[in-house]
Each structure stands twice: as structure tokens, then as C-alpha cells.
């Protein structure tokens, strides 16, 4: 998402539905380090920027990064990269490949001014644990006014070089209609695979139009988290509680923006996730927090067109606020993936920020350890 800155297996499904995560203390998170890429770094004829999603291939250790460039600067694309993540931080980031994301007809995607129905808004990318293909999400286009073509959100599967394979059937309430579905630029971003690749979980970044207003400084809001099989069958859908805005927004042309840009499934505990919530408030800049999320006991809302007043949302525990770490500035952090385990046994997390292709913002890689 672009934000204006002011400076398979039925047995697996059954386990998910019936088993609650084992009660335990929330994990602790510590800061390992960070590094930044040069602004407007050029690679193979493209400008490296707008990195809104990241994943690590556990089979090779290679990373994949998706740009949210809507073909304004270069055709919609993703990159592969090598880097070293250890107990002292992130080192030696090296882009190794650039690949255009391909339309089903084999061509590249158009930019929105073309108004030809071939635009996309790439946000997240994941390595398929089963096939090694890339699955990527995009928000589509809900026009501000009547007339321009509506492009629906989607989760697509691509080969390792970006060729279209197919698309995951999505819940009906993920679709844009006149008065239903996701808000503009607050649609489908976060996606995650279960460890075995049998399940795909997605989160709508902000509340659906029919589910109420966006968060304010006084109250939060409810968006939706959906668990599906990899062929598209909906297993469950839950309300996800977004935090209130962390500050009162100053008046101006740009309103506040808050939501869930990334989520990871816990590889050991079915039904447990780690979610990023990123908020931008005019006059207060960014706040980025990491939450542990458990869906056990939450109401299944897949058949609720409008969320009921007595809905029981998923449970959250805040694990970290990036303001508590020695970062020079809090950026538009949108990407989240597992890194390698440390010798201490801690799991690592790699976060990446979207610089919006702006000179005053940064492409930053942040390493955390989770115990």
C-alpha cells in the first residue's frame, strides 16, 4: 500500500478447526539490527523500491521481494535477493534477479491511467511450500469515481520467473461492489501459508465497507481474516480487531491509514499467527507493531454479510513496538518473513519497509529474534 509521508490435507483442516493453541507465555522479541538500500538503486533496468512483501525460501535460503510499483516506474515485478541474517543483524543485501509479473495472456501489467482492466496493485509474495512457485496478492482497483474499470483483488500463483499459473478463488465478501467489500487501498495484502502448504490465510487490510468505519483515536475497528485450502475452499473466517489510531490526526489533505500489511503462520502451532499492524497518522508519522494472534474460540463469520454485534474476534497479544528499538526512524514497514534460526534456538524475523519511491523514505531491512 502507498502511504503519503510528511517529511489439501483434510486432516490438517480438522486439526485447525478443533485444536486450540497450547497456553504459554507470549514470546519475547529482541532487536538484532538493520540496514538500508540506496535510494533509487538500479538493477537490470529497474528501480528497486516500493518493497511491500518479502519471503524466504527455506529450501534455498533465497529471499523474494515484491514491489508495489503499479507499472508507473517499471512493469509490476518482484526481485530475488541474498542476504546474511545473524545475531548481529542484516548484512550484505544483494539483489540477484528481477522478474516481471505476467498477466494471464503473457504480457506485463498496465499502469492505472491505461484504464484497460490490466492494472494490479502488488502487495505480498509467498513461496509455496509444496511447489516452490510464488503466490502473490494484489489489491486491485476500486475507482474513486464512476467510470474507470474496477479491478478485483486477487491472490495469484506465478512460476519462479513470473509467468501466470492460476488464481485462488476468494470469498465473495473480498470483492468490490458498489456498497460492499474492501475499501479502496485497504484490500487484500497479508497472506500466509501453513507450514505444509495445505492452508492459505489472508487478511483484508482494513474493515469492509459493510462492517463499519475505519479506526479512530478513540476506537479500533474489525477487519476479516480468512483461512482457505489451497484450492480455495473456505475453512473459516474471523473478525480481526485493528488497534485505534495511536494519535489524533492533524488536519490536512491526507487522512490516517492503518491496517494489517503482513501475517505469518506459526509453523509449530496451528491457528496461531504473527501479524504486523502499520499505522500512519498525519502529524505523527508511523507506528508499527507486531502481534501474536490466535484464532481458537473466535466466531466463524464466513456467513455474516455484516459482522454481528456479539462477534468474538481473534485474540491478540502485542509482542513489539518498533519505536522501542534503536531505529533511526520508523518507516512504512510492510513485509514480514521468517529468517534462519540462530544458534541460540531463537527464530528470526526479517521486516522490510516500502519507500514509496520517495527520496525522504527508506528501503530498510530489520532483523528481530523471537524466543
What would you call each of these model-derived segments?
Residues 9-19:
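Bacterial N-terminal signal peptides
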Residues 2-6, 24-371:
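Sequence/structural signature of beta-propeller domains
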Amino acid at each position: 500500500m502507498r502511504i503519503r509521508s510528511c517529511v489439501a490435507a483434510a486432516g490438517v483442516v480438522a486439526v485447525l478447526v478443533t485444536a486450540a493453541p497450547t497456553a504459554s507465555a507470549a514470546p519475547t522479541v529482541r532487536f538484532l539490527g538493520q540496514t538500508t538500500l540506496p535510494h533509487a538503486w538500479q538493477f537490470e533496468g529497474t528501480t528497486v523500491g516500493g518493497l511491500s512483501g518479502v519471503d524466504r525460501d527455506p529450501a534455498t535460503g533465497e529471499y523474494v521481494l515484491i514491489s508495489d510499483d503499479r507499472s508507473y516506474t517499471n512493469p509490476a515485478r518482484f526481485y530475488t535477493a541474498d542476504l546474511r541474517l545473524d545475531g548481529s543483524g542484516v548484512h550484505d543485501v544483494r539483489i540477484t534477479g528481477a522478474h516481471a509479473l505476467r498477466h494471464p495472456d503473457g504480457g506485463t501489467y498496465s499502469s492505472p491511467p491505461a484504464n484497460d482492466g490490466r492494472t494490479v496493485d502488488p502487495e505480498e509474495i509467498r513461496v509455496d511450500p509444496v511447489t516452490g512457485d510464488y503466490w502473490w496478492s494484489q489489491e486491485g482497483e476500486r475507482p474513486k469515481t464512476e467510470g474507470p474499470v474496477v479491478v478485483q483483488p486477487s491472490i495469484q500463483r506465478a512460476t519462479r520467473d513470473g509467468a501466470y499459473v492460476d488464481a485462488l478463488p476468494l470469498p465473495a465478501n473480498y470483492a468490490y461492489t458498489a456498497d460492499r467489500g474492501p475499501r479502496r487501498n485497504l484490500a487484500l495484502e497479508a497472506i500466509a501459508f501453513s507450514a505444509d502448504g495445505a492452508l492459505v490465510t489472508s487478511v483484508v487490510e482494513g474493515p469492509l465497507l459493510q462492517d463499519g468505519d475505519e479506526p479512530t483515536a478513540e476506537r479500533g475497528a474489525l477487519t476479516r481474516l480468512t483461512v482457505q485450502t489451497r484450492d480455495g475452499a473456505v475453512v473459516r473466517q474471523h473478525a480481526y480487531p485493528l488497534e485505534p489510531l495511536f494519535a489524533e490526526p492533524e488536519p490536512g489533505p491526507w487522512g490516517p491509514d492503518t491496517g494489517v500489511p503482513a501475517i505469518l503462520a506459526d509453523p509449530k502451532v496451528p491457528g496461531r499467527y504473527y501479524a504486523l499492524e502499520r499505522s500512519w497518522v498525519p502529524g505523527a508519522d508511523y507506528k508499527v507493531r507486531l502481534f501474536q494472534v490466535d484464532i481458537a474460540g473466535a466466531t466463524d463469520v464466513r456467513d455474516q454479510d455484516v459482522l454481528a454485534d456479539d462477534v468474538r474476534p481473534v485474540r491478540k497479544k502485542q509482542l513489539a513496538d518498533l519505536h522501542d528499538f534503536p531505529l533511526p526512524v520508523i518507516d512504512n514497514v510492510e513485509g514480514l518473513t521468517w529468517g534462519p534460526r540462530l544458534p541460540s534456538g531463537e527464530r528470526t524475523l526479517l521486516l522490510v519497509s516500502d519507500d514509496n519511491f520517495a527520496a525522504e523514505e527508506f528501503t530498510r531491512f530489520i532483523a528481530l529474534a523471537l524466543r
